[in-house]
Regions:
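Periplasmic-binding protein-like
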Residues: 40, 93-102, 121-125
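Extracytoplasmic/secreted envelope proteins and their assembly/folding machinery
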Residues: 55, 59, 82-85, 108-112, ...
Length: 128
């Protein structure tokens, strides 16, 4: 019985060491850049192939530069999209890419103005 406990303990210690080694190597091999650009993207719907392709192309560039892309789908709900913009502000993104569900929504306009006032660049796509 004691032999089984010793083996289990050794296996546990071995797994813990491998985990720590993996974490260490990750941080040594993957360059950390505290100046990574954070981008928030919200399109009126991700059910449209156009927005999927657009987002995939943006994501490729973001990954190449080791930056961060947060993509959200409001599913044609302007209130949800407004909440997403407010979340991007809280996350302190550098850029918001938006295809507005309702470009005339006062709540959405207010949230986007707040983003702009905090220094976030706002890029509107596929809208008049």
């Amino acid at each position: 019985m004691k032999k089984g406990k010793h083996i289990a303990l050794l296996v546990s210690v071995f797994i813990a060491l491998l985990t720590m080694l993996g974490i260490y190597l990750h941080y040594k091999l993957v360059p950390y850049n505290e100046n990574r650009v954070k981008i928030g993207a919200t399109y009126m719907t991700m059910n449209n192939d156009f927005y999927k392709v657009l987002n995939n192309e943006i994501d490729k560039i973001v990954e190449e530069k080791n930056d961060i892309l947060y993509t959200r789908d409001p599913a044609l709900d302007v209130n949800k999209q407004t909440q997403q913009v407010e979340l991007f502000i809280k996350k302190r993104v550098d850029i918001i890419i938006i295809n507005p569900v309702d470009a005339d929504s006062k709540k959405l306009i207010k949230a986007l103005k707040k983003a702009k006032e905090t220094g976030i660049k706002v890029v509107v796509v596929d809208s008049q």
